[in-house]
Regions:
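Patatin-like phospholipase
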Residues: 1-177
Length: 177
């Protein structure tokens, strides 16, 4: 499976003469095709890589692992920013809803039980570890559904505008260092 072929660990997988590697480096997976689906406006994201972490990685392996997390999240963050932008334009009556749709975004994530595992856990291939991850994911999904099921089809459970306000951006009035 190409989705498990991290380029720094495994060779590309060849299928019908075409080489593939993990798509997280480009789009993991792309959200834009979901705009074409007319039966729902909901996008439920199962967040695996944290957007941010407490502390600063200090060792070379920890820094590389964090770079991978940031890389894997980059395309997702760009698409979420575009979804927020289109939604804001629709709310301001600057884009006609119909041709454009306001998407309802939801995020299932469980970072607390995984935090003690540290960064770089994506390289662990132990069966027991996968069973632990499965249990954590099942619990996260159950809790999310219990708390947010009624929001599906009605409203977003992620405040994208607040998410992007919280991300520091360069201050153009200050010189770069």
């Amino acid at each position: 499976m190409a989705s498990a072929c991290l380029p720094q660990l495994f060779q590309a997988v060849e299928i019908d003469g075409v080489s593939y590697w993990d798509g997280g480096f480009v789009g993991n997976p792309a959200l834009y095709p979901l705009f074409q689906v007319e039966t729902t406006r909901d996008i439920v994201i199962v967040q695996i890589n944290p957007i941010e972490r407490k502390g600063t990685p200090r060792t070379a392996p920890d820094i590389l692992a964090r770079v991978n997390e940031i890389t894997f999240n980059a395309s997702l963050m760009n698409e979420l920013r575009a979804i927020e932008f289109v939604g804001r334009l629709i709310d301001q009556d600057r884009l006609p809803e119909g041709r454009y749709r306001k998407m309802l975004v939801h995020n299932v994530s469980e970072t607390q039980p995984l935090a003690p595992l540290g960064i770089g856990v994506d390289l662990n291939t132990d069966l027991g570890f996968f069973e632990q991850l499965f249990a954590v994911g099942r619990g996260a999904a159950d809790r999310w559904l219990a708390g947010h099921y009624d929001a599906l089809g009605e409203r977003s459970t992620v405040d994208l505008a607040a998410m992007f306000r919280a991300i520091p951006t360069p201050d153009d009035s200050k010189p770069l260092r």
